[in-house]
From Swiss-Prot:
One of its GO terms (biological process) is gluconeogenesis. This is Phosphoglycerate kinase. Signal peptide: none annotated. One of its GO terms (molecular function) is ATP binding. Keywords: ATP-binding, Cytoplasm, Glycolysis, Kinase, Nucleotide-binding, Transferase. It catalyses: (2R)-3-phosphoglycerate + ATP = (2R)-3-phospho-glyceroyl phosphate + ADP. ATP binds at residues 197, 319, 345-348. It comes from Francisella tularensis subsp. holarctica (strain LVS).
Amino acid sequence: MSFLTLKDVDLKDKKVLVRVDFNVPVKDGKVTSKVRIEAAIPTIQYILDQGGAVILMSHLGRPTEGEYDSQFSLEPVAKALSEIINKPVKFAKDWLDGVDVKAGEIVMCENVRFNIGEKKSTDDLSKKIASLGDVFVMDAFATAHRAQASTYGVAKYIPVACAGILLTNEIQALEKALKSPKKPMAAIVGGSKVSTKLSVLNNLLDKVEILIVGGGIANTFIKAEGFDVGNSLYEQDLVAEATEILAKAKALGVNIPVPVDVRVAKEFSENAQAIIKKVSYVVADEMILDIGPESQKIIAELLKSANTILWNGPVGVFEFDNFAEGTKALSLAIAQSHAFSVAGGGDTIAAIEKFGIKDQVSYISTAGGAFLEFLEGKKLPAIEILKEKAIR
């Protein structure tokens, strides 16, 4: 790795500042999903085992910067962490002037977004945060695409900055899939809009042998192939781009299996009746909400040949059971595959949970925006600063 990892650093008797991603759902003062907290435990436990003191920082939600708002407080998260790790977790509401913590102890700082200068990563705030510790550990891949005070600025001014266990695992999995994949490689890019995934599609074209599109993205490609998509969600102004991608794929020998059949409905509703049709038979008052059985078979067959699979986004409105068959078939094809598989993005994780294939996916990324930017080939500021620090 081109940056220091947690295991490269002496942590004994050090105050260790850890940027975690504890942006979790909280209802009535209780954390309702502990997945992101559990993901940070290996890093926290390792620091404690090495004789360090742990100071945790995270954001929660989108409060107005500089204003305290109890609904965005991390106090319930500190309680949830204490239950999971079976140790006391002190909570520091006002922490910028210093944190009282000894080796073997854990302190959870209040929401970093209550601090003026967090989003702009001001030097003043970054230096203040850096002065609280001896070592900075970046372990929040989900925020690595943001140059903020608690993810980027602090790393500039603290003596030692490194990657935590979760961040290291995320990058290793993504680099294995993108930079040194075992071929053939398949990527699934689903979701509602081509516009948000256009650069992802273009960046993946010269890396994959199979590129599967789904959801509203697939509808734009169906339109690009000259078929009517009726009342479906698609982007008219990006049909030309989709046509270009199809032409580029053909020239590169990349297989983009645009759906040949679909499940349509007259209305966007959970109770809408699903009608299976060839794409050429979709009429004006119908909307495409899922791929059809023939398309499912084609995708499943293609995925059998893959040795690496990258998955971002569903292929239909899987939240509605009548239109979940395509994403279910895709999930099962990935689960049954021998390939190294990496999945990421909120909807993708929800699909993995719905269809119970968590243990059959090689690596599930906790990130959304950062995952997409990595797929686009963009540099992530919070990772770049770790690389710079390793050279100094």
